[in-house]
Amino acid sequence: MMIQDWMKYLEPLLKLYGKRKHPLNYKNRYQLLIMVILSAQDSDKHINELAENFFNVYPSLEFLAKALPEDLHQYIGSVRNFGNKSEWIVKLAKTISCDDKIPTTLDDLIKLPGIGRKSANVIIRESGTKAEGIIVDLHVIRVAPRIGIATGVQPERIEKQIMAIVPQEKWNEVGMAISFLGREICRPTNPNCNICVMNVVCNYYNELAKRPAI
């Protein structure tokens, strides 16, 4: 389906999810930075469960900068790729040195170990600073082609396509809104299409409607 005015159809989605806080239960930008790194290839739920113990021991970058990577293992040993993540976290703590110096621009964030474009966009969005890109996580990679706002499976390609459609002042909202849709409604299997606010334009739903009943 060719859509001329995507913002018209995205408005209900943005109203539902656009301002919702990220599922990581962080209390400040330092915690957000560390939890975003830990959550890569892991679940937000898992990171939330271990965060309290970790931050009780390492309440700031200053404390973390004094640690060795192996010191972190007892707190994050259940996290996927914990060995590399321990190295990255200690290295960035020594690089930034204090919480007030945590960057909030895309170029500066992606220079940090363990921070890619998606993670940087999450930090920018949650910090409330001007968007420079759009969050494209695994949920967005699945949902965006389903509803028809993007094609392909490459994150940067999907991001560029959505950026070309959505005005910049909505970039911080739209990626996370699509992600929440994927988490709650547009699941990998048995998506709840009948209650989805995007089913009016959704390619997946419209194709599903054409299939003969079994």
Q: What are these language model-derived features?
A:
Residues 3-214:
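Catalytic cores of DNA base-excision repair glycosylases
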